[in-house]
Each structure stands twice: as structure tokens, then as C-alpha cells.
Amino acid sequence: MSITAQSVYRDTGNFFRNQFVTILLVSLLCAFITVVLGHVFSPSDAQLAQLNDGVPVSGSSGLFDLVQNMSPEQQQILLQASAASTFSGLIGNAILAGGVILIIQLVSAGQRVSALRAIGASAPILPKLFILIFLTTLLVQIGIMLVVVPGIIMAILLALAPVMLVQDKMGVFASMRSSMRLTWANIRLVAPAVLSWLLAKTLLLLFASSFAALTPAIGAVLANTLSNLISAVLLIYLFRLYMLIRQ
């Protein structure tokens, strides 16, 4: 059967509209979890204020030089802040991926679904999803740090891994390997969707500072919710595409 991107886009749009409230609630809940965890594990305001003490920002040619000019205590604070942001983001993304994919599965099975039921049903697979998203993020970030293009390629090739992990109950590395093979064979259908997702995420990041005007906490929740909705659309598309490819 011939699969066209237009038909998958149409199916994705219809599902997103029909389940918008549930997907919005999952996105909002995941955003709230991300912000709360980030706040809990982040250094205090007093500690963050120490990062500016005695660090010659104007004389630093880059981030590496800036970190080198910090005291050991400041470097530890920066590491804690970075780890808190990364950890909270990974937790939020894992819950989002599990929740959205379970929504699709439950709706496809003709069952009624709520945000809490979808997240609860995804609980058994969250540890594997967390590891998968961590490894995927690590590979993509390393690729982007090198020449950007390898990172984008990795993001495309690993896009189907979360769907395959949940739908086919694969292991973490098995889903990554299978995703690379299947995506490469269907690159024309996967690449445009992932590139659009990356572009939308980048544009949201550029305007993220404007959300802080609402108060930092509310702005962070709102920005994360919008980011989660963008990711949810991609997950719906990838799930639908994967089911069509398997037929």
C-alpha cells in the first residue's frame, strides 16, 4: 500500500483535534512536573546569584573559558543547575511520550481515556522511555556540538524509537536499532515531520523569554506546555506512520 505524507498529516490533524482536551491536559501536567522538579533540584536563588560574582564575562571568548574562570564552588552550582534542568526535562518528556502513545492505543482500542488514565497506564514503560530519551538526547546533542548536521540526522533516524518501544514492547537498544533501519527506508516520510518539529521548537525557544513577563513560573509552565503540544503532534504522526508501514 502506498503511503503519502499528506494522508498521514490529515489523520494526525483529525486525531489531535478529536483528543485535544486530553492531550492538552497531559501536556500541561508534564509541563508542571518539569517545572516543579526543576525548581526542587535547582540551586537556590542565593547560590545562582554567586555565579555572577567575580566572573569576567566580557573577557571570556566562549563558554569553556567562562567556566574555567569560575571558582570550584561556582562550577558546582552551574553543574547542579544544568543537571536539574536536564533531569526534569527528561522526566517530563518520558511521561509525555508514554502518555500520548497510550492515549493513541486506548482510543484505537475503542476505550474511553483521560489524561490521568493514560499517564497511569504508561507507568510500567516509563523507566525504559526515560533511558531511551536520555540516550537519544545525548546522541543528538553530541552530533549538534560536532557539526549540527549529524545531530539532526540522529534526531530523524531515532524518531520512531519511542513508538516501537511502547507499541512492540521492545528493549531500549533494540528500538533504537529498528528505528534507524525503518526510518532510513522511509526517510521521505519521517524527515519532513522531524525537521518541522525541530523548527517549531527552535522558534518557540526564541520567543520563550516573552513568557517570563507573566512571572517566571507561569511563563515556564506555559512555554513547556506549548513545547509538549508540538511534541505530541509529532508523536501522533509517527505512531500513525508506523502503523501504516507495518501493514
UniProtKB/Swiss-Prot annotation:
It is a multi-pass membrane protein. The keyword Glycoprotein does not apply. Pfam families: UPF0259. It is found in: Cell inner membrane. Keywords: Cell inner membrane, Cell membrane, Membrane, Transmembrane, Transmembrane helix. GO terms for cellular component: plasma membrane. It comes from the Bacteria. Belongs to the UPF0259 family. This is UPF0259 membrane protein YciC. It comes from Escherichia coli O127:H6 (strain E2348/69 / EPEC). The lineage of its organism: Bacteria, Pseudomonadati, Pseudomonadota, Gammaproteobacteria, Enterobacterales.
